[in-house]
């Protein structure tokens, strides 16, 4: 991956100069224990799923020891921790979580599932979150991103993931998930909840760094990535 100093790189300088001491809400450890039964229940639920990944996808997920930027649509995020546990257990994964009070509970829940949390959003502490994500990738850790989260609209691709791919030279892994038996919520994204013991088919698409990305605006590159993932998505 590319070695970049976020303090001096023009694309990150504005983020670095942001007042990054903005308050990040946290909850005491003893309060987070309230979430433990739910975390155990969800882990057991996810363990029953029959996740079928294409043979090439399995090989690349296991073989690639470099940090990856893993892309899910927001409505398919429920299986992200289980997918990583099964196929990239040796690598730590981190997710982007809001710095708000609600985000504090989600970050605590993520930790119980073995997922690290980078606190930030497009509206609050976004610049500092970009820097922290870069540090995680530099340390060899994966990053999982829902480019249309947390508020949508559904299937929108935020330029942030494209900017990270441009500046870190990390491989993007797009995860299109086909659910054979799932409940779909009436939420803004139509969130999927796969039923226990149901089958999920995944054929990951790996997009390696291309030097041409440096000459494409992040928004244009994000739209290109969006079209790629949409073409793989089955609703």
Model-derived regions, located:
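Catalytic core of membrane glycerolipid acyltransferases/transacylases, capturing the structured
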Residues: 66-123, 184
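Non-catalytic C-terminal accessory region of glycerolipid acyltransferases
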Residues: 2-46, 60, 112, 116, ...
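A short, well-structured juxtamembrane/interface segment
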Residues: 43-67, 78-80, 85
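A broad, low-specificity signal marking well-ordered, structured residues that form hydrophobic/aromatic
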Residues: 49, 68, 93, 143, ...
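Hydrophobic alpha-helical segments
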Residues: 54, 85-88, 108, 162, ...
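Conserved beta-strand termini and adjacent loop/short-helix elements that scaffold enzyme active sites
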Residues: 54-56, 98, 120-123, 205-207
